[in-house]
């Protein structure tokens, strides 16, 4: 059920429908499930009026899309960005539903946020906005109903303000938000989880498809886009393992280091981003070996790339950029961002995979970046038990979840993708579609739960 002004949601739905076609041909009863599952259970939209530092009232739109609760409470982030609209949040909530299913934890899918822009705002303005936002949202969320989290524009500071507002409004201390501070109900590894989880997933892909590009080798070249939380911890984990990080980027351009980023450089960038700065402002501080390219993403700037990890935002890899990555010898593309590749880019990668064992193997964000929400689920579990697990315990559980997620996607893609092996590729040598596998495994799990609960028949 797509409206004409919902391009992002239409793209996500079309991707799922395309992946499901071979399965639906042999299991036509699930067509009704697809028809029902694409409609969110509830969409909330509300006015947020807040006071700026000049004492003047400002207004923004607030949203919460409670997409599907067949597997557990609605779970998904709150995005604060001027581009936020209902189409983007429906697409994110839709994807979140299947992503959460792939973690194996008891979580439904949802997404929310506002067109409020935290950039350029004072701490007091952000606090007043968060209090105003929560004064409406609090009626609709709770630890057993809907558990929001952070997202673009919503970091530790915003989560703290939102949690405090809820606690005062409800006069209760519960785990109704994840991404909390470690001293008041948060979990170790949560800030790092999406980036670390992405690398844990990619390690399984490398081991199966191209062990010569193991991440413990300095000769393995890794391109990363974005420079926020996900990209920073992705880069730090790659550097820790021993491979070479070539790039980071932001909305204004890309910062390339052909000799590789250092841990110290990533830490400086993290400090810069915490203050809302742009990458171009830090080039001189990083010293020789770093080149800034204004207005460009990294994908066309690198002559050789082995692993490409989009980590910025949706549709950040175009058809032209995908072709450049294939030409650069890329073997693995795994999304740290949600729907980071356009449909045209995905088609390039999938055609490359089908044509050759040495082609590009693509992993969609709903699988490869599910580490963040997985640790959010672990935070919910810790809150329910009123205890805290150690860093080592949480990291071990995250590795286990990502390994299981990879195996589920691999198995489902092998079984249900309906693909014919390309000429010249041996039957057992072909790489399965992880895109089809993720979509199929997530969809079937949610659809079966919905049927057992009477949501379709």
Swiss-Prot record:
Gene Ontology molecular-function annotations: glutamate dehydrogenase (NADP+) activity
Keywords: NADP, Oxidoreductase
Enzyme Commission code(s) on record: 1.4.1.4
Record-linked CDD domains: NAD_bind_2_Glu_DH
EC category: oxidoreductase
GO cellular component: cytosol
Signal peptide: none
GO biological process, one term: glutamate biosynthetic process
Pfam families: ELFV_dehydrog (PF00208), ELFV_dehydrog_N (PF02812)
List of catalytic residues: 111
InterPro entries: Aminoacid_DH-like_N_sf, Glu/Leu/Phe/Val/Trp_DH, Glu/Leu/Phe/Val/Trp_DH_C, Glu/Leu/Phe/Val/Trp_DH_dimer, Glu/Leu/Phe/Val_DH_AS, Glu_DH, Glu_Leu_Phe_Val_DH, NAD(P)-bd_dom_sf
Catalytic activity of the protein: L-glutamate + NADP(+) + H2O = 2-oxoglutarate + NH4(+) + NADPH + H(+)
Lineage: superkingdom: Eukaryota
Record's subunit section: Homohexamer.
Family (UniProt): Belongs to the Glu/Leu/Phe/Val dehydrogenases family.
NCBIfam families associated with the record: PRK09414.1
PANTHER family: NADP-SPECIFIC GLUTAMATE DEHYDROGENASE 1-RELATED (PTHR43571:SF1)
Protein name: NADP-specific glutamate dehydrogenase
